[in-house]
Structures are given as structure tokens and as C-alpha cells.
Curated annotation (Swiss-Prot):
Signal sequence, renumbered to the chain: none
Pfam families assigned: Transferase
Name of the featured protein: Trichothecene 8-O-acetyltransferase
GO molecular function list: acyltransferase activity, transferring groups other than amino-acyl groups
Keywords: Acyltransferase, Transferase
Inducing stimuli: Expression is positively regulated by the TRI6 and TRI10 core trichothecenes biosynthesis gene cluster transcription factor.
């Protein structure tokens, strides 16, 4: 008699930190070599099947559950992940954009400009209709063939993982893909696999990690909300701009790591202890503000601009947060710094050779990020759990005056270290590593005042490493910024 297999469907609300990011997808592209494209796609498909078998939640779906109480529909709509033992395998399918892509050789020559990574390269939109009764996939993957290679495009639900989680997923996919080119005695299983049920236990894991490192802090809800008013707020206190109809665009700029290191040393010698990240943010923000204001006929009716930065809280919760296995969910909080427009404009007049004069802006950015401590995360998590509608909490929207700036960084996410094996290498016959040629974010033509620090390609210490920043602005401001001598003094020559 045949034995029947008991199939399970498991569901869970995503963690409170996940809920804040549950209305959109993260979309990334990896440009890879592929001398034999059919073979490369076959290897990638088998690798995808392997990693999704190990982590079945990647084959799961997201629904949005609206609580009802006393026969009334509450405003809260929370994301729920469901995963089943009989979920179908994911497929890696071909998806070509409307405009023909250049060859890999040409992409290398151009430096993989942002405008190549258009919206129709991806199988899912950025934004999700959370009022829809439909379920939404956790993960979808496609590839676009190009002469000499392919572009691997990944769409993952942001409520299920953040940028560091996607880096973990990509590394696992690369590892299982690489195995397809190895002999049985050469195959090594990944040593640090995430828990297969990881999304089901996140809220408990966060609490455990926080309790292991944080001092207890008890506050009422109003005190908590007041504390986080500059980062996450109940109401969007500043209405988003509706009057700016200027065309928006985006572009990648290559900054010099050596110049930033030199600047850090100069500032340290002057008693300003900051990071490379805060220096780069200060250089961009101050120059951008100067360029923005210089092109206006009327100054904005506010003396300050706000800098908002995404801060990865994982480092505060290590090592407990990564037990058992890497934590793939969201641990991203925000820090904000308000600096006067006069200070920003004055700082923006200083070029790379006058770095000591930018200390106030760099220090303000650094000090804001240092506020994200374990206790800060603990208090914020408890605040989220007390709020009826976590979706109403969000990053304070940028002012209507077009002077604010938002920055996020995945510079330390090791995408360029992901080795997909010789089938995805420049010399497949030579058994070389199949690491990405470029890692790119989609082209954005609707944001004004945003920056993403792209993953870094680590170089030997004697080389001047390139740090790529993807800047999104009104088109006329971006053109002026790209031609500005002060801003360009920070770029790699």
C-alpha cells in the first residue's frame, strides 16, 4: 500500500521590522560572463532549485491580512508569509527588455550605466498593492541574454529580506550553482545555511538577540513615539511634494577610495572621528545642496535640510541574531541629521583639498548613525508592537522644498564575492571564478534626493578602489552636479 505524505502549510506574520518594508520588492541585477549561455542557464537553474529546496520559504507567498474587531475593519494590513511542502519549484526564465541590450564587452567599456537597467528588465514592479486579495511571490528570477554573457535579475519581497539578506541568498545561489561544475569529491556544502523556517521565528529571534545585549528599558507609548519622531513617525508630518514636475533621472558616480581615506585621516587628526561612509555622504549632500540652491531664483522657506540614512542594526545584535544560521530579515533602522542650509552651502564650496572644513557635516551624519544602539532597536521594536497600524509608521517624508536627502548603503554587502563557478566565468575552460562583472540597481526616474552606495568591489590595498554611488535627482540638478568642480574633485580620476 502506498504511503500518503502529510503536506504542511505554515504561515506567520512577518516581524514588526519586516512589516515596515512589506509594500515593495528589492530588485537587483548581476552582470555575468557566459561563454556557453545554455550551459550557464542550466547551471543557474539547478543552483536555484537547490537553494530553494534548502530554504522552502523562498517558494512561499505573501498575503496581506486585515484584522477585524467588533465587526469593524481595522486600518492595519499586515503581511503574512505562507509556505507549503508542495510549492512548485521556481523557474529561471528569459526576459528581454524592449530595447536591445549592448554586448558584455560594450557594457564593460561603458561601466554598466544605470540607464541600461530599465523597468522592463524585471518580472515584478517595485511597489505592491497591499489592498489586493492576491498573494505575492517571495522571489522571482529572470535573465536577459547579452552577447558574451547574461544579466541575472532578482526580485525579492522586501518584507522577507533586506539587502544583507539578499546578499546571503545570492551567495548561496552562487555556491549551489558552482557545485554543478565540481566533481562529487570536490563538492562542499555551504557551512552556514539559514534556518529553513527562518521567517516563522523572526520576532522571537529579534527579542532573544536584543535581550542578550540590551539593558531593559520601559517607557510608555507616547514617550517612545516622541523618541523616534525624527526616524519613524505615526503621521507623515511633512506632506510630500506635489508641485515639482521636473524630469527626474539617475546616474552612477565613481568616487575615489584613496581620497576618502585621506579625508578620514585629516579629519581624525583634527579630532573628528568619522567613517568613510559619513565623509562620502557629507561630500555629496553638501555639494548637492549648494548646486540645488544656486540654481533657484528663490530660497526655500526653511533654514534646515534633513539627511536620513538607513542603518543596518545587525552589528548591534551579533552574534546572537545569527543563531541558528544567518538572519535574513530586516534589521534596518533610520538615523536623521538636520543641518542648516548655510552650513551645507559653505561646506559645499570646499573641495577635496579643503576637507577639514567639512567636519561639522560629516560629524553630524556620523553622530546620528551612532544613536542606533541595541537599546534603540529594543525600544523601537517595542514601540512597533504597541502601535495598532505599523504600516502608518514610515520614514518621515522629505519636505516639499527639495532640500532633503536620503542615503542607503549596501557597500559592504559581498555581492562581488559570489562565485557562480566556471560556467559563469570569463574563461570557462580554465575553471576560473564566476564572479559578477557588475552589480546594479534598477534605473529610477521618479526620485529626487536619493542615493544608494552600491556594493564595493574589493581591491588590493595599494590600488585606488572605486566606490560607486547611485544618485537620483531632478535631471537639471544632476547635470549641474556632474559638471561641478567641487563635487568632481571627489571622483576617481
Amino acid at each position: 500500500m502506498a504511503l500518503s505524505r502529510c503536506l504542511r502549510t505554515r504561515t506567520a506574520f512577518l516581524s514588526p521590522l519586516d512589516q515596515l518594508n512589506s509594500s515593495f520588492y528589492i530588485r537587483w541585477s548581476l552582470v555575468l560572463h557566459a561563454k556557453d549561455r545554455d550551459k550557464a542557464v542550466n547551471r543557474l537553474s539547478k543552483g536555484l532549485n537547490a537553494v530553494t529546496s534548502k530554504l522552502p520559504f523562498l517558494k512561499g507567498r505573501i498575503n496581506y491580512h486585515t484584522d477585524t474587531a467588533n465587526n469593524k475593519i481595522a486600518s492595519a494590513s499586515r503581511a503574512v508569509i505562507s509556505m507549503s511542502d508542495d510549492s512548485p519549484n521556481l523557474s529561471l526564465r528569459e526576459l528581454r527588455p524592449a530595447k536591445e541590450l549592448p554586448s558584455l564587452a560594450r557594457i564593460k567599456q561603458q561601466g554598466a550605466p544605470s540607464h541600461l537597467f530599465t523597468d522592463d528588465l524585471y518580472s515584478l514592479p517595485i511597489f505592491i498593492d497591499t489592498t489586493s486579495k492576491q498573494s505575492h511571490p517571495v522571489l522571482k528570477t529572470t535573465y536577459a541574454p547579452i552577447e558574451g554573457g547574461l544579466i541575472l535579475n532578482i526580485c525579492v519581497h522586501h518584507g522577507v529580506m533586506d539587502g544583507q539578506g539578499l546578499a546571503t541568498l545570492t551567495d548561496l545561489w552562487a555556491s549551489f550553482t558552482r557545485q554543478q561544475d565540481q566533481n562529487e569529491n570536490e563538492v562542499q556544502q555551504p557551512k552556514n545555511l539559514p534556518d529553513p523556517d527562518e521567517p516563522l521565528t523572526r520576532t522571537a529571534r529579534l527579542a532573544t538577540a536584543i535581550n542578550a545585549t540590551a539593558d531593559p528599558e520601559i517607557t510608555d507609548i507616547e514617550t517612545s513615539l516622541q523618541r523616534y519622531r525624527n526616524d519613524r513617525i505615526l503621521e507623515q508630518n511633512i506632506a510630500a511634494s506635489t508641485g515639482d514636475s521636473r524630469k527626474k533621472t539617475s546616474r552612477i558616480f565613481a568616487f575615489s577610495s584613496n581620497k576618502l581615506k585621506d579625508a578620514k585621516e585629516v579629519l581624525a587628526n583634527n579630532g573628528c572621528h568619522v567613517t568613510t561612509n559619513s565623509i562620502l555622504n557629507a561630500a555629496v549632500w553638501s555639494n548637492l545642496t549648494r548646486v540645488r540652491l544656486s540654481r533657484r531664483t528663490q530660497l526655500p522657506p526653511t533654514p534646515f535640510a534633513r539627511f536620513t540614512q538607513m542603518v543596518d542594526g545587525r552589528r548591534q545584535l551579533l552574534p546572537k541574531i545569527n543563531k541558528p544560521g544567518p538572519y535574513m530579515g530586516n534589521v534596518v533602522l533610520t538615523s536623521s541629521a538636520d543641518v542648516s542650509l548655510d552650513t551645507l552651502v559653505a561646506t559645499g564650496f570646499f573641495n577635496y583639498l579643503s576637507v577639514s572644513l567639512m567636519a561639522p557635516v560629516a560629524q553630524a551624519i556620523y553622530d546620528a548613525s551612532r544613536k542606533v544602539t541595541t537599546e534603540y532597536i529594543d525600544g523601537f521594536l517595542k514601540t512597533l508592537q504597541k502601535v495598532d497600524d505599523p504600516a502608518s509608521l514610515g520614514i518621515g517624508s522629505m519636505s516639499q522644498h527639495g532640500v532633503d536627502f536620503i542615503s542607503t548603503s549596501v557597500a559592504n554587502a559581498p555581492f562581488y564575492e559570489c562565485d557562480f563557478g566556471p560556467s559563469l566565468s570569463e574563461d570557462s575552460a580554465g575553471g576560473k571564478e564566476g564572479k559578477p562583472v557588475f552589480v546594479r540597481y534598477p534605473y529610477i526616474d521618479w526620485a529626487d534626493g536619493n542615493m544608494i552606495l552600491l556594493p564595493r568591489r574589493r581591491q588590493p590595498t595599494e590600488n585606488d578602489e572605486t566606490i560607486e554611488a547611485y544618485i537620483m535627482l531632478a535631471e537639471d540638478d544632476l547635470v549641474a552636479l556632474a559638471e561641478d568642480p567641487g563635487f568632481c574633485s571627489w571622483l576617481k580620476e
